[in-house]
């Protein structure tokens, strides 16, 4: 059984995370590098992190970048019958995806589990009975969005003042200010 989950997301002030299958803001290189570093870096030699994403998130990744390198890619879908091209695993639910980590072929290969979207996958992960960290890139302005991050209770989530390898100062790229935040919920 998975002891902890990590969610990583970039959100606008209005809690928007997407528009028509894309990010609603221009690509922010330092945020992209932060996402890569956090989801790829394993704390255990010879293990990889596992990234879980919904079908729409998988197909929003440019084909040349699928699967996300250096990570075990799991796509969640109740509709898909076949594994999407180049994905490593297909699961019907978050529970099924997490059970994969107990299978012999993955049991000794997976370090951390990262939820990378979309909205319904985040919502399911946030109600999962385990410790959870939310790695939030807080975009400090509104953007027009059609997909939103689920509301979360700040009474249950503690904002960590510092976290290893996460910058705490405000960043700015392409006239967009943002900051990295880490929240923790203990089960």
UniProtKB/Swiss-Prot annotation:
**Does the keyword field hold Membrane?**
no
What metabolic or biological pathway is this protein involved in?
Cofactor biosynthesis; tetrahydrofolate biosynthesis; 5,6,7,8-tetrahydrofolate from 7,8-dihydrofolate: step 1/1
User: Which residue spans traverse the membrane?
Assistant: none
Sorted keywords for this record are: NADP, One-carbon metabolism, Oxidoreductase
Reactions catalysed, as given in the entry:
(6S)-5,6,7,8-tetrahydrofolate + NADP(+) = 7,8-dihydrofolate + NADPH + H(+)
- Listed binding positions for NADP(+) are 10, 16-22, 55-57, 77-79, 117-124
Q: What is its EC number?
A: 1.5.1.3
| UniProt binding sites for substrate | 31-36, 71
Enzyme class, top EC level, equals: oxidoreductase
Q: Name one Pfam family in it.
A: DHFR_1
Molecular functions per Gene Ontology: dihydrofolate reductase activity; NADP binding
The organism's superkingdom is given as Viruses
Q: Which residues belong to any copy of the DHFR domain? A: 4-185
A GO term (biological process) for this protein?
dihydrofolate metabolic process
- Family as reported in the entry's similarity comment: Belongs to the dihydrofolate reductase family.
Q: What does this protein do?
A: Key enzyme in folate metabolism. Catalyzes an essential reaction for de novo glycine and purine synthesis, and for DNA precursor synthesis.
Tell me what this protein is called: Viral dihydrofolate reductase
Could you tell me which species this protein originates from? Saimiriine herpesvirus 2 (strain 11) (SaHV-2)
Q: What is the lineage of its organism?
A: Viruses, Duplodnaviria, Heunggongvirae, Peploviricota, Herviviricetes
State the gene name recorded for this protein.
DHFR
């Amino acid at each position: 059984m998975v002891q902890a989950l990590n969610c990583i997301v970039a959100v606008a002030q209005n809690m928007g995370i997407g528009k028509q299958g894309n990010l609603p803001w221009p690509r922010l290189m330092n945020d992209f590098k932060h996402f890569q570093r956090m989801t790829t870096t394993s704390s255990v030699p010879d293990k990889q992190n596992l990234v879980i994403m919904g079908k729409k998130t998988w197909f929003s990744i440019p084909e040349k970048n699928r699967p996300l390198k250096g990570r075990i890619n799991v796509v969640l879908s109740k509709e898909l019958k076949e594994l999407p091209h180049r994905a490593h695993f297909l699961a019907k639910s978050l529970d099924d995806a997490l059970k994969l980590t107990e299978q012999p072929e993955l049991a000794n290969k997976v370090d951390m589990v990262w939820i990378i979207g979309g909205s319904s996958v985040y919502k399911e992960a946030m109600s999962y009975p385990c410790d959870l960290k939310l790695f939030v890139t807080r975009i400090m302005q509104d953007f027009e969005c059609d997909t939103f991050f689920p509301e979360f209770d700040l009474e249950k989530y503690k904002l960590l003042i510092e976290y290893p390898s996460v910058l705490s100062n405000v960043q700015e790229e392409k006239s967009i200010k943002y900051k990295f935040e880490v929240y923790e919920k203990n089960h």
